[in-house]
Amino acid sequence: MGQKIHPTGFRLAVNKNWSSKWFASSQNFPEMLKQDIEVREFLKKRLGHASVGRVTIERPAKSARITIHSARPGVVIGKKGEDIEVLKQELQKRLGVPVHVNIEEVRKPELDAQIIADGIASQLEKRVMFRRAMKRAMQNAMRLGAEGIKIMSSGRLNGIDIARSEWYREGRVPLHTLRADVDYATSEAKTTYGIIGIKVWVYKGELKPGQVQATPAAPEKKMRKGARNAAAN
């Protein structure tokens, strides 16, 4: 089932944590969940140029604390903190409670699955060849210490008439191993031919419950393409 299940949900409480941290009664839960989804969509549109990775939402005692993980925190904050104050006011209007916004810098954006997926989507919208964008992202991730990375693109690739999926992998990406630190994210590229979906898996090593540092594993040298395509040829 490791092939089918969401890699982050599969590893919750083992080496992954929740993106929303709050408790609500059965009556308030749907509304609060809807607010979380709307806030994430709003931040994705508003901060699309700021290389945003994760967004964590906490709700302590009639307030909200939103942590934005960004590779370009200066873009989010703005000159003298003007942009962050405007952003905070807009979030307070949406949530209806006082909001505290924290910005955390992503030290290695080349290893963040969400930033990688959004970067590839941005390149595809600028008519960059999908293979070139995927391989460039894989090379950058492996160069900066990833144990393995897998990227899949689905849709009308290069404008072909029939949609298909194509994936590449470098190193190893274990999907069944719970102690494996696998970062997973998806993104969409809106091209003139339609929407192209991108999925990214980044394997950073093995972790034991409560352990912070990853144990390096021996990477594979071969880069594989879809097995079905190879068999068909």
Swiss-Prot record:
Q: Which UniProt keywords apply?
A: Ribonucleoprotein, Ribosomal protein, RNA-binding, rRNA-binding
The record, for InterPro entries, names: KH_dom, KH_dom-like_a/b, KH_dom_type_2, KH_sf_prok-type, Ribosomal_S3_C_sf, Ribosomal_uS3_bac-typ, Ribosomal_uS3_C, Ribosomal_uS3_CS
RNA-binding as a keyword?
Answer: yes
UniProt GO MF annotations: mRNA binding; rRNA binding; structural constituent of ribosome
Q: Name one GO biological process term.
A: translation
Q: Which cellular component terms (GO) are annotated to the entry?
A: cytosolic small ribosomal subunit
Pfam families according to UniProt = KH_2, Ribosomal_S3_C
Superkingdom, taxonomy of origin: Bacteria
Asked whether the UniProt record includes Ribonucleoprotein among its keywords, one would answer yes
Instruction: Return the annotated region ranges for Disordered.
Output: 212-233
Domain spans labelled KH type-2: 39-107
Q: Which HAMAP family match?
A: Ribosomal_uS3_B
Cited PANTHER family: 30S/40S RIBOSOMAL PROTEIN S3 (PTHR11760), SMALL RIBOSOMAL SUBUNIT PROTEIN US3C (PTHR11760:SF19)
- Into which family does the record put it? Belongs to the universal ribosomal protein uS3 family.
According to its UniProt entry, the function of this protein is described as:
Binds the lower part of the 30S subunit head. Binds mRNA in the 70S ribosome, positioning it for translation.
- Subunit info? Part of the 30S ribosomal subunit. Forms a tight complex with proteins S10 and S14.
> What is this protein's record name?
Small ribosomal subunit protein uS3
Biological source species = Chromobacterium violaceum (strain ATCC 12472 / DSM 30191 / JCM 1249 / CCUG 213 / NBRC 12614 / NCIMB 9131 / NCTC 9757 / MK)
